[in-house]
């Protein structure tokens, strides 16, 4: 098939993997210098929305690739790959306007839409008096469709959404019309038929639908969101105050990220997959499971130089919803502090099988080898 270019502020690993599987090129357009910036004293007065799309890069990429080769523009809220950082309403509006200027659908990966709305409410001018639901309504007003895993801001054990705006840019670009402009193939109906024939009629039991009906409203509760984001910030500040290098500040909406290049003082090369070594030692020594979302998961070694520059070599500490106490977080802070002191002993990792498998971090095997 055709090699399309699909720009985003940050494709998540599975999204990027699926784009590559269909023979197209994912691009992540964000401000890496801003992301790694450490504020004076560890805190910003207002969140700088480090998850924003770099709109200058977006327009330049569309012009370089040609609008006909860009089937959609994709924005992830919050930006999981870019350390869970939020996207401002102004940036959503601007990114959508650029996409529409070239007749391109603007899509959202909205798995963490409520957390993003919380950051807008508490940091962006003009939104302090608006409810989470009102802010969400405006966020979604700028897109032509969205995907969302509802195990995140749906507060449910399963479920997801693929939604398209009626008569939006996606519908116009991917439906078929006759000479008089009448619809001959409606892409929405086509996708629904494919979904039913592949997965059954929505595939949910009544229990799951009821959980989602409650969960989507629960996620709009301001005090719940405030507690969740505060836990993330508490963990990040605990790492920072203990002198651990590489902590991304401020914390995102669902977790804390550590830049492995900084953590290891720039001494580990990309092919060492040291973030995986960090993850291995943290669970082996202290029973704490984290996710490497850097050189290994994002397949740094298989990318072009311009794509490599868009990789954040990080490890993610995702915070369980409404489960952890301050004592849990204090234990994590203490454990990572001890591991940081002994970071020279953390092994490197090599792939022993499945190096070129699609989405290899789900399938491949690794083994540790000593750091020398």
Language-model segments: residues:
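Conserved PLP-enzyme active-site core in the AAT-like
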Residues: 1-244, 269
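Extracellular structured ligand-interaction cores
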Residues: 159, 253, 314
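Conserved small-domain helix->loop->beta segment predominantly found in fold-type I
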Residues: 200, 204-280, 284-311, 347-357
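Glycine-rich beta-alpha junction loops
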Residues: 77-79, 112, 152-154, 252-254, ...
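Short beta-strand-to-loop capping motifs
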Residues: 164, 258-261, 319-321
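PLP-dependent enzyme catalytic core of the Aspartate aminotransferase-like
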Residues: 219, 285, 297-372
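Short, conserved charged micro-motifs
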Residues: 78, 265-274, 322-331
